[in-house]
Curated annotation (Swiss-Prot):
One of its GO terms (molecular function) is uracil phosphoribosyltransferase activity. This is Uracil phosphoribosyltransferase. Disulfide bonds: none annotated. Allosterically activated by GTP. It comes from Pyrobaculum arsenaticum (strain DSM 13514 / JCM 11321 / PZ6). The lineage of its organism: Archaea, Thermoproteota, Thermoprotei, Thermoproteales, Thermoproteaceae. It catalyses: UMP + diphosphate = 5-phospho-alpha-D-ribose 1-diphosphate + uracil.
Length: 211
């Protein structure tokens, strides 16, 4: 399945707190960080592993070695993704980090996105690239970020991480990159005339940084 909904009860609890309009910016940021960590751990479960034997101070034990943790790139879409990526890095502490900065352009009811800054580490076929943005609304911003990834290199695996997605955003991404995996905590049904997710949680960047 290209779309995975994180139905862990604590993830759903955190999402409920984020949706609540009375949640302050500090708790909102903390919630995004915690969700990033949870989603990251769910992603780790999908990595291949092998059994290894290690020597403890008192004997020998069989454990696991996860393969590919040193071949992860996390791309954050500024600025709303910053707390989410902070959590993802807890699960992938050796990840290389990329950044995409984009702005919305609204003209006569039409919403477009302009990338005005992009900086990527090297990307190769052995890498898993995780592109993070709390809100996968129209999919336009995410598509621009993925384009920046492929301008740099072709990853072996591409994963989109969001907190809330919409069918429109999911369809836009998968129609262009059908092998992409999408991890999200919820899928909301609607977009309003400003291209915000309804019911959603509002503007994630503004709420996280009290602007």
């Amino acid at each position: 399945m290209p779309v995975r909904i994180i139905d862990h009860v604590y993830a759903q609890y955190l999402l409920t707190r984020l949706r609540d309009k009375n949640t302050g910016s500090l708790d909102f940021r903390k919630g995004l960080v915690r969700l990033g960590r949870i989603i990251g751990y769910e992603l780790v479960k999908t990595f291949p592993f092998r059994y290894v034997e290690v020597e403890t101070p008192l004997g020998r034990a069989v454990g696991v070695d996860i393969i590919g943790l040193d071949k992860v790139v996390i791309v954050q879409i500024l600025r709303a993704a910053m707390p989410l990526v902070e959590g993802l890095v807890k699960a992938f502490p050796n990840a290389r980090l990329g950044v995409v900065a984009a702005r919305r352009k609204e003209e006569e009811g039409y919403v477009d996105v302009e990338v005005f800054y992009s900086k990527m580490p090297s990307i190769g076929v052995e890498d898993t690239v995780i592109v993070a943005d709390p809100m996968l609304a129209t999919g336009t911003t995410m598509s621009k970020a993925i384009e920046e990834v492929y301008k740099t290199g072709t990853p072996g695996r591409l994963v989109v991480v969001s907190v809330i997605a919409t069918p429109v955003g999911i369809s836009r991404v998968l129609s262009r990159w059908p092998d992409t995996e999408i991890y999200t905590v919820a899928i909301d049904p609607e977009l309003n005339d400003k291209a915000f997710i309804v019911p959603g949680l509002g503007d994630a960047g503004d709420r996280a940084f009290a602007t």
